């Protein structure tokens, strides 16, 4: 999972730079074409281009694609218009959102301790986005929206048949994101990218594939309670990229909010693990 987060953080760092020059739809399309080509080549070499899929898997695959497309569009929009570390930190309330959605949609029972962690964790998000101050950036709402699309993506990933190759899932996801760029293209003015920008987009495609493959493998075969905490490693990568390339020094509110989000997220997972083990006794 740490390798997956490195891939995603590296992609984000490049996208933030490219987003100052190219519109998002063009970024999605060009990066997508490169990613689709590389993934198709990988699937071909592994004889996984044509896969037999049970009909009852179609809905889960479709929901996963919808979740991935939604989180990609919303998060990249936020990323281009926010500090890299801030946008990334907001995404780390994912474990809290997973628990919240499990209660609302899956009717899972959650005690007062985890409810308290959820409330405190979302308070940490508020500290980062500063809704009542002059420093409020409404693009942070896009990052929050992306979280719930990631919840949809990850929950449906766990429902996928283990027999479906991770590379194939990554390929059809990349194709869908690429078509999303085409759909939004009439609403944005595309420009001819320079060689430097094109190479940067190629790098984002490589890092994206890196992140997707490891993420799919971890979420499918890993124990969620063990794997998900390693998502927080992306904060470290995002801060380093922000400081080195964008001179974005984390402020006190960002640090405080991030600590709260990570602490409550870890507590929520370990409390859930404790509750399940207690019920099995």
Regions found by a protein language model. Give the residues of each.
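Hydrophobic/small/kink-forming positions within alpha-helical transmembrane segments
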Residues: 5-10, 40, 65, 69-73, ...
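Juxtamembrane helix-entry segments on the extracytoplasmic side of multipass membrane proteins
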Residues: 29, 53-57, 125, 130-149, ...
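Cytoplasmic-side transmembrane-helix entry/capping segments in multi-pass membrane proteins
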Residues: 1, 55-65, 110-122, 139-144, ...
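Hydrophobic transmembrane alpha-helices of multi-pass small-molecule transport proteins
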Residues: 113-130, 253-272
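Membrane-interface interhelical linkers
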Residues: 1-3, 36-63, 112, 162-164, ...
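C-terminal transmembrane-helix exit sites in multi-pass transporters
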Residues: 75-77, 94-116, 236-255
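Helix-helix packing/entry segments at the starts of transmembrane helices
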Residues: 30, 87-93, 160-176, 213-243
